[in-house]
Amino acid sequence: MLYLFRKLADIVIKRPIVVLVIILSISAILAGFATQSVSVQDVVTGDNELTQALEVIDDVFGEPTSVLQVVLESDKDIRSADALSALNSIEGAIHQSELSGTLVTDSQQPAIVSFLSGVEQAAQEAGIDPNYLDDDMVVALRQQSLEMLPPQFADLFESLLGSGSPPTTGLMLVFQNTTGLNSIQVTDQQRELADVISAVDITQDLTVTPFGFGLLLTANDPGPEIGRLFGIALVIILIILAVVYWFKPQAGQRRMIFRRTAADVVMTLAVIIMAVIWMQGIGVLLGPEYLNIIGHFSPQTQIVPILIVGLGVDFAIHLFSRYRFELGSSGDPEKALRISMTTTGLTLMLATGATAIGFLTNLFSPVSFLATLGVLAAVGITAAFLLTVTFLPAIRLILDRRAARKGGLPLKALASQTEGGLSRIVERTAWLAERVPVVTIVIALLLTVLGGYGFTQLDNEFNLTDFVPKNEPLLLTYDTIVEKFEGGFEERTQVLITGEAISPQIHNTLINQIAKVKEIPGVQSFGEFADANSIVSVLGQAFSTDLAFELASLGITADLRVSDDTDVEALYSLLIIKVPGADQVIARSDNDDLITRVDIRTSAGQDGAATLAANLNEIFAPLEETGMKVVATSRLIAQARQSEAIEDSQVLSLLIALAGAMSLLVIYFTINVRRPLIGILTVLPVGLVLALTFGTMAITGIPINPVTATLAALSIGIGVPFTIHFTSRFLEERVKENDCGSALRRTVSQTGSALTGSALTTAIGFGVLITSSLIVFQQLGYVIVYAITYSLMASILVLPSMLALWDSWDRRHHESPS
C-alpha cells in the first residue's frame, strides 16, 4: 500500500498538469450524468409483508375514491349562518368548476357532505327561507335534521363537528373519483380541487383550509431547504477554513500568507464541489436508469452533500497541515509532498475505508432510502479522498514551485505554525496519558456503560410529518384534524385476506370476526357496526335490491351466514357481477386464489398503529386456522413496523460497522508495523463515542428515526478517522522518540491540534442542520455535533492513555518500536 502512494506521489510530482487535466475531465463527464438525477419521494418503503399487502391491495382493488377534508375554523361557534353560507359557496364553486366531473356519482355515496348538511332541507320543511337564517336557527335546525336521521347516519354527521364547547371547527368532505389514477395523480387532482376551494371568497370571520395527507407531504419541496443548508454550511466552513489555514506571518509576509490562505480555501472548495459532482454522477450511473444497484435520489438523500462538506473538508485540513509542516522543515515542495502523501495520504485512505464501511452498513437498513443514502455517502467520501490526494497536491505543487522560483515561500512562518496557542493548549491533555492512563480509561468505561444504558431508553419514531417543515400551514391543519376530529376521515386500515378457496366455514368465520371489529380501540363505528367496506357491507347492499330472493336460494340467511352446503364460490361470483362496488372487496388473483379485504375507517394515528394492527390480527386469527392468510396493514402500520425494524437493525449495523472497521485496521497494522493489537485499540474509543452519543440523545429527547438511524455510520465515519490520524502519527513519533511521553506530546501537539481544528470546522458546518425547518434534519444536526465532540474527546483524551499502556507493554515484549 505504501508503494502505491509512493507511485502516486511520483506521478503528481512529475506530471501535475496531466493529473489536473484527468481530474477535470472526469469531473466534466460525471457532471453530465449528474444533471440526469431524478428526485423521488421515498420514505415508507421496504420489502415486508405489510408493504407487499399494500401493493396487492393497490394492484387488485385500487382506491376508487379519495376524500378531501375541508376544515372550517372560527373564533366562535362554527354552527353559524356565515359557515352555512361559506359551505354553500364552496359547494357551488366546485360544481361550477372543471373538476365537477371528478366528483363521485355513486348513489350510495354523496359527493359532498358537511357538518351542516341537512340544515337547508330542515329549513325548507319548516317553511323558513334558508337565506334568512341566523346562528341560533342554524343550531336548532341542525339538531332537528340529526334527529330525523337513523342513528348511524346521525353519528356520522355529528363526527364532522369538531370537539369543544362550543365547537369552533367543522369539516366538509369532498369525494372524488380516482379510478385508474396513481397516488401522484390523486394528489394532483386534490391539489387542483383545493385551489378551487381556496379561491372562494369567504367572510373574514372564517378560515377555510382544504387538507389531504398527500397535499401535506408534497406541499414543500425539500430541495430548496437542502440547498439553503448546503450553502450556509459551505460559507461557514470556508470562513472557519480561512481561520484554520491562516498562520502567523513573518515581517512583510502578510500579503503572501493571505494569498496562500485564500488559495488553500479555494482549492478545498473546489474539492468539495467536485466531490459532490462525482457523487451525483456516479449515483445516477448506479441508479435505476443505468445499473439499478441503488434507488432514486430522494429529498432525504440530498443531505449527502452536507455530509461531504463536513467530512471531506477534514481530508484537506489534515493533508495541508502535514504538507505545511514538512515544507517548513525541509524547504523542498517535492519532498514535503512525498512525505505527506506517504504518511497522511495513507492515513486518509484508512479513514476513507472505515468511513465507507460505516455508511455501507445502511445497506442492511429496512428503509430503502437509507441504503441509497449509505451508498451515495460512501461514494462521495471516496471521491473526496481521491480528489484530496490528486487534485489538491497537484495544484499546490504547481503554485509552490512557482513561489520557490521567485523566493516567495514563507518557510519560517510555515515552520512555526505548530507553535500556536491551540497546539500548546491541546498538548497539555497529554498529561492524562502520562500520569493517570488507568484512571482515564476507567472513567471512559464508566461513561460507556452509562451511555449504553441511555441507548436502552431511546424512543423509536417514524412520522412522515417530521419531513414537513415546521412552518408549513397544512401541518397546523393536520394537528387540528387529529385533535378535533380523532384523525379525520383519511385514515383507513386494510385487512387483506387471501387463500386458495372459500368454503362455508371460512365465510361464516369471516362474518363472525368482522362483527367483532367494532370492539377494537381506534376503529370508527357506523351505528352498531364498524365503519368498514367488506363482504358484510356488500351483502347488506345486495339484500336491499332484487337479489334478495336469489341470495336466499343460494343459502344466505338473514344474519349473512351460509349453510354448510352453500356454494360460496358461486355466491361471491354473483356478488362481483351484480352488486356495484363488490369488486372493491372481493377479487380473484391470476392463480384464481380468493382475495378479499376489510377496509376500515380508523383513528389510531401513528402512536396506536402497531396496537391496532395487533388487535386486528388477533380478531381475524381464526381465519388463519382455516388456511387463509391475514395481514392487517396501512401506511401508518407500515411506518410503525419500519420503526421497529430500524431499532432491531441498529445493533446489527453497529456490530457490522465496528467489525468491518476493526478488521480493516487490524490487517493494515499487521502488514505495516506487525502490531495487530493497534488496530483494535484504534477502534475501541469509537465505542465510547457511540455510547455517549446515544446517551445524550436519550437525555435531549432525540429518538431513533430513519435519519438519526444513520448514527452508526456517522459515528464510525467521524470517530474512526480521528483515532486513525492520532494512532498513525503516534507510531511515527515513537520510532523517532525513545520516550513514550515525548511521542505522545508531539502527537497531541501536531495531530491533536489539526483534529481540533477539523472538529470545530465540521461541527459548525453540520451544526447548520440545527437551523433546518425539518425536524429530522434538526435532530441529525444535534446528533452529528454530539458525535464530533465525543470523537475529539476520545481521540485526544482516551486513546492516548490506551496507547501509553500499550507502548509500555509493547516495549517489554519487542526490541524495536517499529
Predicted regions and their residues:
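Membrane-embedded transmembrane helical bundles of large multi-pass transporters/channels
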Residues: 1-42, 178-460, 604, 614, ...
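Feature of extramembrane
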Residues: 1-262, 402-655, 808-818
